[in-house]
Amino acid sequence: MAKKIRGGEIIALIGELGSGKTTFTKAFGKALGIRQQISSPTFVMMQQFETPKGLFLYHLDLYRTKNFADVKSLGITEWWGHPKTVTVIEWADKILDSLPKNTTIIYLHRDA
């Protein structure tokens, strides 16, 4: 998936606690060439990383948000779809109806 990234993509991750949303983002970032430690941004809500190709990976965690108004008030949506960004959103189900139509949605499930 990371090999097909050109910029402007938005990836929505949906799954319960412990289903692998952050693990997916770590592997995705590594595949993009990011060497920094990627962790869950639950308390800061967003982390930004630059790839060797000059793209910026924005990693969002919406666990503590209630709705799209919370996200929009932070100014986060201003760079969605920008050709120099790739956005991965954890807990995207909270704003699914407000995401652009070309968003890639990935559902993750925990093993029993």
Predicted regions and their residues:
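Pre-Walker A adenine-sensing motif
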Residues: M1-K4
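P-loop (Walker A) phosphate-binding loop of NTP-binding proteins
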Residues: I14-E16
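Switch II (G3) loop of P-loop NTPases
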Residues: L57-N67
